[in-house]
């Protein structure tokens, strides 16, 4: 059904939770393709033991290069990009499939809704050790946001042909900040107008575990927000904030396909 690509950096405890949730809570058969950055914590041995395909660099390739490598191994028509600190809710794939079937073409970008560190505030733990899976499974259906416009976040699903057409993630965004809205801009330019965040497709998000883990490590670059914003601005001629407001209408309620922006006074002077 889906080829699920996941970047990971010495984060085996969370990767295991993520993979087990996919196996346990899916209706269909998927392939899981992590990209292992460094992986000196036993990650590659774990993946081989579980007969999972993966890509590997001995250095920190981070999100863009790593996901482009993993996507080359995808055998299914749809590529789902996820983080290794996600726990997938039950029937997530059935929910996504219904959305894909309703659209009936390939020009779309569908994403999920993040619980805990994301759109929905439901605390079921902030670590692998204190994650209350039972609480999440009992309460996630009653914790809701809404279907929303203009998501630029994982987990997201696009057709493999569309991924290949735009070249996947742009690798100049090292280690990754800014690459999500950049991908959306490339999709916009080839005619994608459905950028839908789906309330019922939920993942529990522990919250940028790797960024927190390596924040003070001078050898591991994990966050370059200002650099990513600058690259986007120089590349596209406007900021990420501007793109999300005037093009994607991010976080407003989903009302259907987006239209070209209304180039009024606010567009030019705000």
Model regions and ranges:
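Short, well-formed alpha-helical segments that are part of the catalytic scaffolds
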Residues: 11-24
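Short aromatic/hydrophobic "clamp" motif used to bind/position activated sugar donors
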Residues: 79
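A short, conserved alpha-helix in the catalytic core of glycosyltransferases
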Residues: 96, 150-158, 162-167, 172-201
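A conserved acidic beta->alpha catalytic loop
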Residues: 21, 28, 35-45
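Active-site donor/metal-binding and catalytic loop motifs
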Residues: 115, 174, 196-219
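A recurrent flexible, glycine/aromatic-enriched loop bordering the glycosyltransferase active site
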Residues: 64, 137-161
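Glycine-rich, basic loop-to-helix element that forms the pyrophosphate-binding segment
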Residues: 57-74
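Conserved donor NDP-sugar-binding/catalytic core segment of glycosyltransferases
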Residues: 90-128
């Amino acid at each position: 059904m889906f080829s699920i690509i996941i970047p990971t950096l010495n984060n085996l405890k969370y990767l295991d939770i993520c993979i087990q949730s996919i196996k346990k809570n899916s209706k269909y058969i998927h392939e899981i393709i992590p990209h292992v950055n460094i992986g000196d914590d036993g990650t590659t041995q774990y993946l081989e033991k579980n007969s999972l395909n993966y890509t590997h660099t001995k250095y920190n390739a981070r999100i863009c290069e790593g996901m482009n490598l993993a996507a080359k191994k995808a055998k299914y028509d749809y590529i789902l990009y996820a983080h290794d600190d996600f726990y997938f809710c039950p029937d997530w794939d059935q929910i996504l499939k219904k959305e894909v079937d309703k659209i009936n073409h390939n020009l779309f970008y569908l994403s999920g809704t993040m619980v805990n560190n994301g759109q929905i505030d439901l605390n079921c733990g902030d670590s692998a050790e204190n994650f209350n899976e039972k609480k999440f499974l009992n309460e996630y259906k009653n914790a809701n946001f809404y279907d929303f416009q203009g998501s630029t976040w994982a987990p997201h699903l696009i057709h493999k042909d569309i991924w290949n057409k735009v070249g996947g993630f742009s690798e100049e965004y090292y280690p990754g900040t800014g690459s999500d809205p950049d991908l959306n801009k490339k999709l916009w330019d080839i005619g994608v107008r459905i950028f839908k965040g789906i309330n019922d497709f939920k993942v529990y998000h522990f919250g940028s575990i790797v960024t927190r883990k390596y924040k003070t490590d001078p050898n591991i670059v994990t966050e370059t927000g200002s650099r990513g914003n600058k690259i986007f601005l120089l590349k596209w001629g406007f900021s990420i904030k501007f793109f999300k407001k005037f093009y994607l209408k991010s976080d407003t309620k989903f009302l259907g396909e987006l239209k070209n922006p209304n180039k009024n006074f606010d567009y030019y002077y705000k």
